């Protein structure tokens, strides 16, 4: 049974400006493991990765029904790549839940959809 569906989209320029204004923005969004993946990329691919994770985490919070705030922060949600390159939510997974995530990019934006099944 589907517990929730979340969708989010963000402009790449908005993410780039946030990083330029405050480099600690990256620490607010990415976990340590995600940051290691982020650091492997160069140039515009870094912004695409960060924007994709931002959108995916927003989509997760929407699918979860909580949004971000007192009970959930960006670094509480971790999305890593499995060996075949697909994104996979590694935390927080509640017992009995399956989380599906899809991330896409264009030249100007990143979008993500999350479905949580229970």
Curated annotation (Swiss-Prot):
Domain of life: Bacteria
Lineage: Bacteria, Bacillati, Bacillota, Bacilli, Bacillales
Role noted for this protein: Transfers the 4'-phosphopantetheine moiety from coenzyme A to a Ser of acyl-carrier-protein.
The protein's enzyme class: transferase
GO biological process: fatty acid biosynthetic process
Name listed for the protein in its UniProt record: Holo-[acyl-carrier-protein] synthase
Cofactor(s) this protein requires: Mg(2+)
Keywords, alphabetical: Cytoplasm, Fatty acid biosynthesis, Fatty acid metabolism, Lipid biosynthesis, Lipid metabolism, Magnesium, Metal-binding, Transferase
EC code: 2.7.8.7
Chain sites annotated for binding Mg(2+): 8, 58
Family classification: Belongs to the P-Pant transferase superfamily. AcpS family.
Substrates-to-products reaction catalysed: apo-[ACP] + CoA = holo-[ACP] + adenosine 3',5'-bisphosphate + H(+)
Subcellular location: Cytoplasm
NCBIfam families in UniProt: acpS (TIGR00516), pantethn_trn (TIGR00556)
InterPro entries the record matches: 4-PPantetheinyl_Trfase_dom, 4-PPantetheinyl_Trfase_dom_sf, ACPS, Ppantetheine-prot_Trfase_dom
UniProt-listed Pfam families: ACPS
An example molecular function term from Gene Ontology annotations: magnesium ion binding
One GO CC annotation: cytoplasm
